[in-house]
Amino acid sequence: MSGSGRIPLWVVATIAGLGIITVLGIFFYGAYAGLGSSI
């Protein structure tokens, strides 16, 4: 992991960021959907 990999760091960061945003989005959507259906 000395920066000599074939995958650029910005590609890894972008994919990781999108994955985190997607997980957070699904989590918050599920929380709000569950909260709305329980009321």
Curated annotation (Swiss-Prot):
Its main location: membrane. It is found in: Cellular thylakoid membrane. One of its GO terms (biological process) is photosynthesis. GO terms for cellular component: photosystem II reaction center; plasma membrane-derived thylakoid membrane. Keywords: Membrane, Photosynthesis, Photosystem II, Reaction center, Thylakoid, Transmembrane, Transmembrane helix. The chain crosses the membrane at residues 7-27. It is a single-pass membrane protein. Pfam families: PsbJ. InterPro entries: PSII_PsbJ, PSII_PsbJ_sf. It comes from the Bacteria. Belongs to the PsbJ family. PSII is composed of 1 copy each of membrane proteins PsbA, PsbB, PsbC, PsbD, PsbE, PsbF, PsbH, PsbI, PsbJ, PsbK, PsbL, PsbM, PsbT, PsbX, PsbY, PsbZ, Psb30/Ycf12, peripheral proteins PsbO, CyanoQ (PsbQ), PsbU, PsbV and a large number of cofactors. It forms dimeric complexes. One of the components of the core complex of photosystem II (PSII). PSII is a light-driven water:plastoquinone oxidoreductase that uses light energy to abstract electrons from H(2)O, generating O(2) and a proton gradient subsequently used for ATP formation. It consists of a core antenna complex that captures photons, and an electron transfer chain that converts photonic excitation into a charge separation. PANTHER family: PHOTOSYSTEM II REACTION CENTER PROTEIN J. NCBIfam families: PRK02565.1. This is Photosystem II reaction center protein J. It comes from Nostoc punctiforme (strain ATCC 29133 / PCC 73102). The lineage of its organism: Bacteria, Bacillati, Cyanobacteriota, Cyanophyceae, Nostocales.
